[in-house]
Amino acid sequence: MTNLQERGHLLTELVNPNSLNLDQLSSLELVELFNSEDQKAVAAVAAAKVQLAEAIDSTAERLRHGGRLFYIGAGTSGRLGVLDAAECPPTFCTPPELVQGIIAGGAGALVRSSEDLEDSIEDGEAAIAGRHITQLDVVVGITAGGTTPYVHGAIHAARQRGASTIFIACVPAEQVSIDADIDIRLLTGPEIIAGSTRLKAGTVTKLALNMLSTGVMVKLGKVYGNRMVDVAVTNQKLRDRALRILQDLTGLSREAAGFLLERSGKWVKLALLMHWTGLEKDDGDRLLSEHQSNLRAAVMSYQNHNQS
């Protein structure tokens, strides 16, 4: 990492010429300014599309072979990683340990600012050691300004353990360099409030993490078409969603879809396979296991076998 005591030259620290009169704007003008600046977040993701796609493919391959995905960061970056990780179990029915968020300062830093804890390289290294990271795992270091010692310590420790490393920052590589397998730069420019990286940098980070985790889960067969067929049916809202998916894809009545869902053990993916093939629960479960829980692959295998 570039040793930086003076950070004023970093892209995320520069003064935005478009917001010099911020304290004189009307509320409508302020909203319009934010809306205009936020377009740069979408453009920044588009500019990094090749690296993001590479990150999706690399991560999916590791997870397919038993690896785990870790996000690590401090402050806003750390909170966004924890948020994205926390959404994977209800959306894709993944075990909590498959995608994990690590934030400097631990759980307390989620609700109370603990930015002073980001300055320790050793703490970042210890966080990696504490998760028993191996060569199967993927570690994504997130730091808007690119300089967070906690994140750099974690990336260095992860590389030493043979893990795949991905770096996400909102400054160009010539300002802050790092040795990582995939280097993603999301360049949104100076913030509306100079240095407040919870704004555009936070927005673009959320967009990138949405793409990364969702893309990985798509590659792992967690969706069928654009349907959430691995949804965890843990409350009334998610049960309703599960029933609507079954109704839409099978043409069944809501009552029949509910019966099918119960027969499958509340697993939408298995319920669909049972309906389309006529298999019972255990046989359907076995067929899915043979195809790494990929519903489309399981259905095609069944059809090919029965046509031959």
UniProtKB/Swiss-Prot annotation:
GO MF annotation list: carbohydrate derivative binding; carbon-oxygen lyase activity; ether hydrolase activity
The catalytic activity, as recorded, is:
N-acetyl-D-muramate 6-phosphate + H2O = N-acetyl-D-glucosamine 6-phosphate + (R)-lactate
Q: Which residues are the signal sequence here?
A: none
Keyword terms of this UniProt record = Carbohydrate metabolism, Lyase
Residue ranges of domain SIS in the record? 59-222
Q: Please give the pathway this protein is involved in.
A: Amino-sugar metabolism; N-acetylmuramate degradation
Q: Give the matching InterPro entries.
A: Etherase_MurQ (IPR005488), Glucokinase_regulatory_CS (IPR005486), MURQ/GCKR (IPR040190), SIS_dom (IPR001347), SIS_dom_sf (IPR046348)
What GO biological process terms are annotated to this protein in UniProt? amino sugar catabolic process; N-acetylmuramic acid catabolic process; peptidoglycan turnover
Its quaternary organisation is: Homodimer.
What name is this protein filed under? N-acetylmuramic acid 6-phosphate etherase
Per the record, the similarity remark reads: Belongs to the GCKR-like family. MurNAc-6-P etherase subfamily.
Name of one Pfam family that matches: GKRP_SIS_N
Q: What does this protein do?
A: Specifically catalyzes the cleavage of the D-lactyl ether substituent of MurNAc 6-phosphate, producing GlcNAc 6-phosphate and D-lactate.
Q: Where is the active site?
A: 87 (proton donor), 118
Which organism is the protein's source? Nostoc punctiforme (strain ATCC 29133 / PCC 73102)
The misc remark on file is: A lyase-type mechanism (elimination/hydration) is suggested for the cleavage of the lactyl ether bond of MurNAc 6-phosphate, with the formation of an alpha,beta-unsaturated aldehyde intermediate with (E)-stereochemistry, followed by the syn addition of water to give product.
Return the PANTHER family for the record: GLUCOKINASE REGULATORY PROTEIN (PTHR10088:SF4)
Record has Heme as a keyword: no
